[in-house]
A protein has these predicted regions:
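Phosphate-ester processing/binding pockets and catalytic centers
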Residues: 2-266
Length: 266
């Protein structure tokens, strides 16, 4: 599935496309009556991250808002994590918490790293992504002149639609946990006001990216998806294009890998 932001054609289209109130919508009867299969031994972890913001002036860096969900069945990945830690240590970043945007722009802990070192760090983390038995899905909207309330309405509608359309998938698991770093209130609000009503087995837990490679993966995927949309519309910034060299390399070496990990919806 190729991620495409929905572009409203006019104000009437914008209004007609938003049908959920600011309060969490009342769930359809069939969702309340959904029966999940108990006694399953599998556990599902869902790691959540976002790209963009819901307020402030709209410019080329804030035209879209994306929420990424990474699905992971809690398999043993310690071998992959140990290999990644060794590679990061060899590049001068032991116990490293990967963060995509500062890496691309050479900021924060990457400020003193050369472009070659930063690209190697990215390649190592992309290799880690390829090895992971994980899938992802994104919820994306084009902000345009939407208020924060309208952004919330659109996001929560898409979130509920996704879960409703994949109830059979979620029924495979006896325990489902959503992990989020509480980075933005709008995402936390969507999780808190919908998850328990639709999936009774689910819980929401706070986690920091520093202690979770899967949250760092969610950050990577979310950022790359956002850059993919940006490259097709307004174009990459100078630093972004310098890091990836050009749009072709971004698509070939990064976005294609991400696309292979996409969650296949029912």
């Amino acid at each position: 599935m190729t991620l495409q932001p929905y572009i409203f054609q006019d104000e009437e289209d914008r209004i007609d496309s938003i049908t959920y109130s600011v309060q969490a919508p009342e769930l359809p009867f069939e969702l309340h009556e959904a029966r999940f299969i108990y006694g399953k031994s599998k556990n599902l972890s869902i790691y959540v991250d976002e790209s963009g913001n819901t307020g402030g002036a709209v410019n080329s860096n804030s035209l879209w808002y994306i929420i990424c969900l990474v699905f992971f069945e809690n398999e043993d990945i310690s071998e992959y994590e140990d290999e990644l830690e060794y590679k990061f240590s060899m590049l001068g970043h032991p116990d490293h918490c990967f963060h995509t945007s500062p890496l691309i722009h050479g900021e924060n802990c990457y400020a003193n790293d050369s472009i070659n070192v930063r690209r190697k760090i990215m390649r190592n983390f992309m290799s880690f992504l390829r090895q992971l038995p994980a899938k992802h899905i994104e919820i994306c909207i084009e902000k345009k002149n939407l208020t924060e309330e309208k952004i919330y309405e659109s996001l929560i509608k898409q979130f509920i639609d996704f879960i409703e359309n994949n109830l059979q998938y979620f029924s495979r698991y006896s325990n489902i946990t959503f992990y989020y770093d509480n980075g933005q209130n709008i995402v936390l609000k969507i999780l808190e006001e919908t998850v328990k009503d639709i999936i009774p087995e689910a819980t929401i837990e706070y986690e920091t990216p520093k202690h979770s490679r899967l949250l760092q993966i969610a950050d990577l995927i979310c950022s790359l998806k956002w850059l993919g949309i940006k490259s097709r519309t307004v174009g990459l910034s100078y630093k972004e294009e310098y890091f990836f060299m050009d749009d072709r390399h971004l698509k070939r070496d990064f976005l294609r890998i991400v696309e292979k990990k996409e969650f296949k919806q029912n």
